[in-house]
């Protein structure tokens, strides 16, 4: 369904936190950790949350927008750095978030005559269409905003909350914390006190760096673009390497996941040389299956570099609080052969390899992983990079602004060949994920994905 020509921007409101901050710990800047630097130039992350308000159209301007705008301002009392600016000046050894009294977050107000149900019913959309529901960040080589929001009204009274954020300021867990806090304030009204678990911690001292990993990344980032050129202080995110791709939504049901587990176990019994996977978690099983579908659909080259992000908040010593705001994620990287993944034991190979690298992350010094990342960050011509984003462990129901949780969610992957896991409703044991691929590639993947699920179902009968 094409909606690109039907979205009209009505207004852009600059929303500032109240003049008197409730958190006096905020100074004029916040430093970045090595986890933040890892994402300094990554493409912006984007989310689309669709809500049924059950309100008349007239309430959009009279009630919905004022409520969202005012609660956003109150939320920024505790999340003040999100209204700041990421900069890397010529006089600074490192980038930082600058905080000023006149900082604000842009809130775009838009409307469309598109039918949202058609958008939900069709699992495939053009990426350019979805971008019409998403606001841009203000970015340049020297400065970048951290957050932009857009509210779009549909004729049915449904609304879409579009979010674009700079990854250097926050990871998925931090964004989820911000949205839960905003939703809590919006839902309760009149500046309610936030529960302690919804108050962010921006103190960078929680990220211990005794081996100076941060300097490794600063040296890497400052490398001149050309030999003998100036040191590279750009904070501009990379542009997405595609704008003509299809966005595809897929789902693995509880039965699908159990069938996959049984298939892995069966293959292990047949091949005694293979050790059982260290983990049979839902994420490992899902990623293993999707990765083998990628390979069987002919979407990879001779080798695959698979990147699975791991939240290190509880893995660091000492552990980092759950409400720490920033990045605390590292991508576990492992190389695999496409021939091995396409073979009869491909599902086992993928599951075992993915689970083992996570176990290795638990047991090893994190500096080693960062050093290996810098040494092996280039992709050869015979290698395809397949990454994972998002999380199934964030709850959609916690994003209730007063109209119930989102009816639908669409993540917009920042990279091609990126498996983006979606948040789930409480009690949902299935997995939704999305991909961004060229139209023909999407058709090939869908065919292999569905056909192999049917084979698994027959084997389980």
UniProtKB/Swiss-Prot annotation:
A motif (DFGWG motif) lies at residues 400-404. Keywords: Acyltransferase, Detoxification, Transferase. The keyword Acetylation does not apply. GO terms for molecular function: flavonol-3-O-beta-glucoside O-malonyltransferase activity; O-malonyltransferase activity. The keyword RNA-binding does not apply. InterPro entries: CAT-like_dom_sf, Plant_metabolite_acyltrans. Its EC number is 2.3.1.-, 2.3.1.116. Belongs to the plant acyltransferase family. Phenolic glucoside malonyltransferase subfamily. This is Phenolic glucoside malonyltransferase 1. The gene is MAT1.
């Amino acid at each position: 369904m094409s909606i690109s020509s039907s979205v009209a921007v009505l207004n852009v409101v600059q929303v500032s936190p109240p003049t008197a901050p409730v958190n006096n710990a905020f100074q004029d800047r916040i430093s970045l950790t090595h986890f933040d630097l890892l994402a300094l130039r990554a493409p912006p992350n984007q989310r689309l949350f669709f809500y049924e308000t059950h309100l008349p159209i007239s309430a959009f301007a009279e009630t919905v927008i004022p409520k969202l705008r005012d609660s956003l301002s109150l939320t920024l009392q505790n999340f003040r750095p999100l209204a700041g600016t990421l900069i890397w000046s010529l006089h600074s050894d490192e980038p930082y978030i600058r905080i000023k009294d006149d900082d604000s977050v842009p809130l775009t107000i838009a409307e469309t005559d598109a039918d949202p149900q058609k958008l939900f019913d069709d699992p495939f959309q053009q990426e350019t269409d979805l971008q019409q529901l998403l606001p841009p960040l203000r970015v340049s080589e020297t400065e970048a905003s951290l957050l932009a929001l857009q509210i779009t009204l549909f004729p049915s009274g449904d609304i879409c909350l579009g979010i674009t954020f700079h990854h250097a300021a926050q990871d998925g867990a931090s964004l989820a914390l911000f949205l839960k806090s905003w939703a809590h304030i919006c839902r309760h009204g009149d500046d309610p006190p936030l529960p302690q678990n919804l108050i962010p911690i921006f103190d960078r001292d929680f990220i211990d760096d005794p081996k100076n990993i941060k300097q490794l990344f600063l040296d890497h980032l400052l490398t001149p673009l050309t030999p003998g050129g100036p040191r590279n202080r750009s904070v501009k995110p990379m542009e997405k390497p595609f704008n003509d791709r299809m966005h595809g939504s897929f789902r693995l049901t509880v039965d699908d996941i159990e069938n996959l587990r049984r298939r892995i176990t069966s293959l292990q019994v047949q091949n005694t040389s293979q050790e059982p996977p260290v983990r049979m978690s839902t994420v490992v099983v899902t990623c293993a299956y999707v990765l083998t579908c990628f390979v069987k659909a002919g979407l990879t080259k001779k080798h695959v570099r698979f990147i699975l992000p791991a939240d290190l908040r509880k893995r660091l010593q000492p552990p980092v609080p759950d409400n720490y705001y920033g990045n605390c994620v590292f991508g576990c990287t492992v190389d695999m052969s496409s021939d091995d993944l396409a073979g009869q034991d491909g599902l086992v190979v993928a599951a075992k390899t993915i689970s083992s690298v996570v176990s290795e992350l638990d047991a090893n010094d994190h500096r080693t992983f960062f050093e290996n990342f810098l040494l092996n960050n280039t992709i050869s011509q015979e290698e395809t990079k397949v990454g994972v984003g998002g999380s199934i462990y964030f709850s959609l129901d916690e994003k209730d602004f007063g109209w119930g949780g989102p009816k639908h969610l669409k993540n917009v992957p920042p990279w091609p060949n990126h498996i983006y896991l979606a948040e789930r409703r409480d009690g949902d044991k299935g997995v939704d994920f999305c991909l961004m691929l060229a139209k023909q590639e999407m058709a090939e993947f869908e065919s292999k994905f569905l056909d192999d699920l049917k084979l698994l179902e027959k084997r389980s009968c």
